[in-house]
């Protein structure tokens, strides 16, 4: 009887986690988490102290913690009952940038700035929201 060498497959099982990690990142402070979803980037704040924009009447879930921008057009404040917080996401060090499908995010000591091809986007931090 012959024995076949076993081939380790555990590395293959980890591939989806690796791909997911490449699609998202967090700020060095651990307060901002961002993730790509198609051609849109979404960033969530864990803690914030600024006044949130008025909640739309049709928003019956969490409001003012999540922001998004696509490759064209204005940024959005999201009505979202979920989160993209992933404590295992790679850290985008201060001074570094992240590019994906027409959106670029810059990690800065003052917060996270994400901008699209139209020059529209947002800047967020614990103390500030600026949509432009």
Predicted regions and their residues:
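N-terminal signal peptide c-region/cleavage motif recognized by signal peptidases
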Residues: 16-18
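Boundary of Sec targeting at the N-terminus
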Residues: 20-22
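A motif-centric signal for short, conserved binding hotspots located
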Residues: 37-38, 46-47, 100-102
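A low-complexity, Ser/Thr/Gly/Pro-enriched, surface-exposed linker/loop concept
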Residues: 41-92, 124-132
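Acidic, glycine-rich flexible loop segments
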Residues: 84-111
């Amino acid at each position: 009887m012959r024995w076949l060498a076993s081939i380790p497959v555990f590395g293959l099982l980890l591939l989806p986690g690796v791909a997911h990690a490449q699609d998202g990142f967090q700020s060095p402070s651990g307060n901002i988490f961002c993730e790509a979803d198609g051609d849109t980037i979404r960033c969530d704040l864990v803690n914030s102290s600024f006044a949130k924009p008025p909640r739309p009447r049709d928003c019956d879930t969490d409001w003012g913690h999540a922001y998004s921008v696509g490759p064209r057009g204005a940024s959005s404040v999201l009505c979202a009952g979920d989160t993209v917080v992933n404590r295992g996401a790679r850290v985008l060090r201060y001074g570094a940038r992240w590019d994906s499908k027409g959106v670029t995010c810059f990690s800065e000591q003052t917060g996270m700035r994400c901008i699209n091809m139209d020059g529209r986007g947002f800047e967020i931090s614990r103390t500030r929201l600026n949509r432009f």
